[in-house]
Amino acid sequence: PLATFTNNLATMIDRIREETGAEIILYSTFPPNPKWHYGSHNMEAYAMATEQMAREKQCAFADVYHNWLAIESKKKPEDMLSNNINHPNDFGHWIYFEVLERVGL
């Protein structure tokens, strides 16, 4: 559930900072292929929760979710997924790269 996800994410961020002092970048997931009937199709809620957590914990945030949707308006999901379900192919990984580069990496 979403509440468990956000609690676990907050715990991980706190622990990483306490134990390592490392910089933290949170990134959202991408939407699943809408043709996949067995997937979790509420990924937007998780993307928004991750963005909110980044604001609350003052972490960098890479918005893969909305960038993926913008590209998906011009390409089919199958063009970005290696298994046509939930694993990005090289183009899907390029989207992650582009979003992370905009964050400053």
Language model features by range: what are they?
Residues 1-105:
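Alpha-helical cap/lid subdomain in secreted, periplasmic
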